[in-house]
């Protein structure tokens, strides 16, 4: 018989014994409630059967408890054995970590790595095109700022200060020649002189009045 079948049979017998003990106990109590004398054979038979079922139930319960405790202890031992096996396998797989000289080798490796990191930082600092001082005030140097100002001055439009102006007229702008701030602006165009009136007889003062002269010719 397998282990599972044996456990099932034990549980079934325990359940049957428990049911039988309850039936005989109920019969005994019923007879007692009905006033049957304890000397009555019916009461004696029911009581003895209930007592026997009760004792059997107690014995089976204790047996089941002992078996259960043994099973629990065996489980604890099994767990401990499995734990030890797992620890042994783990240490075997990592036995190189158990070397007493491993700590010294780790310290030496850390020192080598630190030295290599410092060498890398020095190489990066030497290869950098921009030093920390050049970037302290921004990426533009003072010379770059001066160059930008010069570009702005040469590209700005220039105002003619010698051109005649009239009320409401717009100022005349012209870019500087050849892009140089010191170049002279083109001179303004010359104005043609007004023509003089043609010579002729003197104007008659009376002609301006609009009246014809009454005097005949020769007077």
Curated annotation (Swiss-Prot):
Alphabetically ordered keywords of this record: Host cytoplasm, Host nucleus, Phosphoprotein, Virion, Virion tegument
Ranges of biased composition (kind: Pro residues): 186-202
Asked if the record carries the keyword Ubl conjugation, the reply is no
Judging by the UniProt lineage, the source's domain of life is Viruses
Modified how = Phosphorylated.
- What InterPro entries does the annotation carry? Herpes_UL14
Q: Does the keyword Transferase apply?
A: no
GO CC entries:
host cell cytoplasm; host cell nucleus; viral tegument
Q: Name one Pfam family in it.
A: Herpes_UL14
Q: What is its main location?
A: virion
| Compartment(s) of residence | Virion tegument; Host cytoplasm; Host nucleus
Q: Which family does it belong to?
A: Belongs to the alphaherpesvirinae HHV-1 UL14 protein family.
What this chain does, per the record?
Contributes to the nuclear transport of the viral transcriptional activator VP16 during the early phase of infection. Therefore, participates indirectly in the regulation of the immediate-early gene expression. Additionally, seems to be important for efficient nuclear targeting of capsids.
Name this polypeptide is given: Tegument protein UL14
UniProt lineage = Viruses, Duplodnaviria, Heunggongvirae, Peploviricota, Herviviricetes
């Amino acid at each position: 018989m397998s282990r599972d079948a044996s456990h099932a049979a034990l549980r079934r017998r325990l359940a049957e014994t428990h049911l039988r003990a309850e039936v005989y106990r109920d019969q005994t109590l019923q007879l007692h409630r009905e006033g049957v004398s304890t000397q009555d054979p019916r009461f004696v038979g029911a009581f003895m059967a209930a007592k026997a079922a009760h004792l059997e139930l107690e014995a089976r319960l204790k047996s089941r408890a002992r078996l259960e405790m043994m099973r629990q202890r065996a489980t604890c031992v099994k767990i401990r054995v499995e734990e030890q096996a797992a620890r042994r396998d783990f240490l075997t797989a990592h036995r190189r970590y158990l070397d007493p000289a491993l700590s010294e080798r780790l310290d030496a490796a850390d020192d080598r790595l630190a030295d290599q990191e410092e060498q890398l930082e020095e190489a990066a600092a030497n290869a950098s095109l921009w030093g920390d001082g050049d970037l302290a005030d921004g990426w533009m140097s003072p010379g770059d700022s001066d160059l930008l100002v010069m570009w702005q001055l040469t590209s700005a439009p220039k105002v003619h200060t010698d051109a005649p102006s009239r009320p409401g007229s717009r100022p005349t702008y012209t870019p500087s020649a050849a892009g140089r701030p010191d170049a002279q602006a083109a001179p303004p165009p010359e104005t043609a002189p007004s023509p003089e009136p043609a010579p002729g007889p003197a104007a008659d003062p009376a002609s301006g009045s609009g009246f014809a002269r009454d005097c005949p010719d020769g007077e």
